[in-house]
Swiss-Prot record:
This is Major fimbrium tip subunit FimE. The name (major fimbrium subunit) does not indicate the abundance of the protein, but is derived from the greater length of the major fimbriae. In strain ATCC 33277 and strain ATCC BAA-1703 / FDC 381, major fimbriae are 300 - 1600 nM in length and about 5 nm in diameter. In contrast, minor fimbriae are only about 80 - 120 nm long. This length difference is observed only in a small number of strains, including strain ATCC 33277 and strain ATCC BAA-1703 / FDC 381, and is due to a loss of function mutation in FimB, a protein that restricts fimbrial length in other strains. It is found in: Fimbrium; Cell outer membrane. GO terms for cellular component: cell outer membrane; pilus. It comes from Porphyromonas gingivalis (strain ATCC 33277 / DSM 20709 / CIP 103683 / JCM 12257 / NCTC 11834 / 2561). GO terms for biological process: cell-cell adhesion. Disulfide bonds: none annotated. Residues 22-51 form a propeptide.
Length: 550
C-alpha cells in the first residue's frame, strides 16, 4: 500500500508538469482533461436581527476556492470561483470517478503546485490562519460520485473557523452596573481552516482542532472594549478547555463597569464560560456564546490584571447565564426579529414588529410555525397586555396605559417543534426620557425651556450640550437629534440640512452611544439679529426650547 501511494503521488506530480491549467492561473496544477464549468450556491447559515459591521464580518464571502481531491484524498487542483451574490461558478476537470471538494472561503492558497499529490489529511490540518481580515475564513467538504460538464454542485453550507461572543448586561436598575463594556481575553491567536480528527482521518463538525504553536492573541486595549448590550460582538478561535486549570489562562470575558453608582470608580470582573453545573465550555468554531448578566452583588477587582489573575466572578459576585449555541444564529433554522428592544413613550395603544423564520436548508420563510408568548418580570407592571401573530410575521402588541412609571414585558418569539430557537423582544411603556442635563451655552434648561443671551452679529457661537440618561438602552439606536433654526448654522460635522413643515432643521443621526453619553453641537449665528426660539427634538425625549436673546 505504501509503495502504491508513492507511485500515485509521483503520477500526480508528473501530471502537474504536463497538463495545462484548469483555471485562469496558467501555472495551476490539475489533472489531464479539458476543464468544465461547474456552479453552485452558498447557503447563508444565519440571518441577524441586528445588522452592521459584525454581520458583514460573519457572512461575507469575498473569495471562494475549490480544492479538488481524488477518491483517495490526494490533491489534484485548485479552482478560484467567480462569485455573484450567493451563487458561484468555477472551472474544474470533469471526472467519472469520485471527487472530494473542499470549499474554502476568504483564503488564498499561495502555491497549489507544492501540494499536488498530497493527502487532504495532511494538507487541511497543517494550514492555520490568524484573525487578520475583515472577514472570517469558512470551509465545507463534499464528496461527489463524479463531476460532469456543467454540473450544479448544489448548496454549500460553510462552517466558520471562529466562535462568536456577546455580553448583555441588564439595565442598572436591575444589574447595579453602569457604563458596562467588555472584551474577550485569553483567546488563541490562530486557528485551522477545517476541523479534523487525527484518530479517524475525518473532518467532523464539532471536532476541536487547535493548530501547532498557538499562543494567546494580543490583549484587547481598554479603548477597544465594546458596549455590553448584546449587540456588539467579539470573535475568537476554538480551544479545548476540558483539561486546563484556572492558572493556565482560561478563555474569558472581562467586564468593566461602575458598581451601584453612575459616578463610582470602574472595577473589573472575569467571566468564565460555564454551564449551570459550573462545567466549563469548550470554545468551538461556528458556535455563539451568549452571556447575560442580570445582577452584580459586589464591585469587581480594582484593575484589569487583578481580574484576569483572580477567580471568575460567575456565581460569586455576579448572577450570569451562559448559552453555548451551535451556530452564529442559535438553533436550527433562522429566526429573526427586526427589533430586540422597543420603547413606547407617546401613549400608543398598540405597536408592531416583524418576525421571520426560515427553516434549515430553505430560502423561503415559514410563518406558520411562529409562536408568541408574553411574560412580565417579577415586581414590574406589564407593558404588553396581549401579543398575537397577524400573519406574514407581523406581531401586533396591545400596550398597557402609559403612567408615570416604567412598565415592561418580554415578548418571546418561538418556533413550533424547535424549543431551542427563540428570540426575546423587550418592550417598555413609559413617559418620555429626560436629559440628565440640557444646556444652551452655560444656561441649563428647566421644565424643558432654556434662555441664553448671545451678542448680536454674525459668527457668534451657540453650544448645545446634553447628557443622555443611563437607562437609555443602546438597542434603541439609531436616534435622530433635530435642531430647528433659521438664524444659526452648524459647526459640528455630520449634521444634515433639511426642511420639515416649512422650517429649516439640522439633523444628526446617533448610531453609537457617545463617551459618557454626552452630546455637544456647536452652531454659529448667520444673521446680525439672531434672536429666535429654537426647537430641539430627539426620538423618545421631551422636546426642548432654546430662547435666544440678543
Amino acid at each position: 500500500m505504501k509503495s502504491k501511494s508513492i507511485i500515485a503521488q509521483l503520477l500526480y506530480v508528473l501530471i502537474a508538469f504536463m497538463a495545462v491549467s484548469c483555471v485562469a492561473d496558467k501555472s495551476e496544477p490539475c489533472p489531464s482533461g479539458e476543464p468544465t464549468r461547474v456552479s453552485g450556491s452558498i447557503v447563508s447559515l444565519e440571518h441577524h436581527g441586528l445588522r452592521g459591521a459584525s454581520a458583514d464580518k460573519e457572512n461575507s464571502v469575498e473569495r471562494l476556492e475549490l480544492w479538488v481531491f481524488d477518491e483517495d484524498g490526494h490533491f489534484l487542483e485548485r479552482a478560484v470561483a467567480d462569485l455573484s451574490g450567493s451563487t458561484f461558478t468555477a472551472k474544474i476537470i470533469p471526472s467519472e470517478v469520485e471527487r472530494r471538494i473542499h470549499f474554502i472561503a476568504n483564503y488564498e492558497l499561495a502555491d497549489p503546485s507544492v501540494w499536488v499529490g498530497r493527502s487532504e489529511r495532511e494538507m487541511l490540518p497543517s494550514i492555520s490562519v490568524a484573525d487578520d481580515l475583515e472577514t472570517i475564513r469558512m470551509w465545507a467538504r463534499i464528496s461527489y460520485p463524479s463531476i460532469a460538464p456543467n454540473q450544479n454542485l448544489g448548496q454549500i453550507q460553510l462552517l466558520r473557523n471562529m466562535a462568536k461572543f456577546s455580553l448583555s448586561v441588564t439595565p442598572p436598575a436591575e444589574s447595579k452596573l453602569y457604563d458596562a463594556s467588555y472584551a474577550l481575553y485569553n483567546s488563541w491567536n490562530k486557528g485551522t481552516l477545517a476541523p479534523f480528527d487525527p484518530n479517524t482521518g475525518s473532518f467532523p463538525q464539532g471536532q476541536i482542532t487547535e493548530p501547532a504553536g498557538v499562543v494567546f492573541a494580543n490583549p484587547t486595549s481598554e479603548a477597544a472594549f465594546k458596549e455590553a448590550d448584546g449587540a456588539h460582538f467579539f470573535y475568537g478561535f476554538e480551544r479545548d478547555q476540558s483539561n486546563i486549570g484556572t492558572g493556565a489562562g482560561i478563555t474569558c470575558l472581562i467586564l468593566k463597569a461602575r458598581y451601584n453608582l453612575p459616578n463610582a470608580d470602574y472595577t473589573y470582573y472575569k467571566l468564565d464560560f460555564v454551564d449551570t453545573n459550573k462545567v466549563r465550555y469548550n470554545i468551538t468554531r461556528n458556535h455563539f456564546y451568549k452571556m447575560i448578566l442580570k445582577k452584580a452583588k459586589a464591585p469587581g477587582r480594582p484593575t484589569l490584571q487583578e481580574a484576569l489573575d483572580g477567580a471568575a466572578a460567575n456565581n460569586i459576585f455576579l448572577s450570569a447565564e451562559v448559552q453555548a449555541l451551535p451556530a452564529f444564529s442559535d438553533g436550527s433554522g433562522m429566526l429573526t426579529v427586526d427589533h430586540t428592544y422597543m420603547v413606547f413613550v407617546q401613549g400608543e395603544p398598540s405597536g408592531t414588529f416583524q418576525a421571520t423564520y426560515i427553516p434549515q436548508g430553505q430560502n423561503n420563510p415559514d410563518y406558520s410555525k411562529l409562536t408568541v408568548s408574553v411574560s412580565t418580570p417579577t415586581g414590574q407592571q406589564a407593558a404588553v397586555t396581549s401579543a398575537q401573530h397577524e400573519g406574514n410575521g407581523k406581531i401586533k402588541l396591545t400596550l398597557a396605559q402609559q403612567e408615570n412609571l416604567t412598565k415592561r414585558s418580554d415578548v418571546v418569539i418561538g418556533v413550533q417543534g424547535n424549543p431551542d430557537l427563540k428570540r426575546s423582544v423587550t418592550v417598555l411603556v413609559r413617559e418620555k426620557y429626560q436629559y440628565v442635563f440640557f444646556k444652551a451655552n452655560t444656561s441649563s434648561a428647566e421644565n424643558n425651556q432654556v434662555t441664553t443671551q448671545i451678542s448680536a452679529g454674525q459668527g457668534n457661537e451657540l453650544l448645545i450640550s446634553a447628557k443622555l440618561p443611563d437607562v437609555l438602552n443602546a438597542a434603541l439606536l439609531p436616534i435622530t437629534f433635530k435642531v430647528y433654526t433659521e438664524h444659526f448654522y452648524p459647526k459640528t460635522g455630520g449634521m444634515i440640512l433639511g426642511i420639515e413643515g416649512g422650517k429649516t432643521l439640522y439633523k444628526y443621526v446617533l448610531t453609537t452611544m457617545p463617551q459618557n453619553k454626552e452630546l455637544q453641537f456647536r452652531f454659529k449665528s448667520n444673521k446680525v439679529n439672531s434672536a429666535e426660539n429654537i426647537a430641539v427634538k430627539m426620538d423618545y425625549f421631551h422636546d426642548q426650547t432654546i430662547h435666544v436673546t440678543n
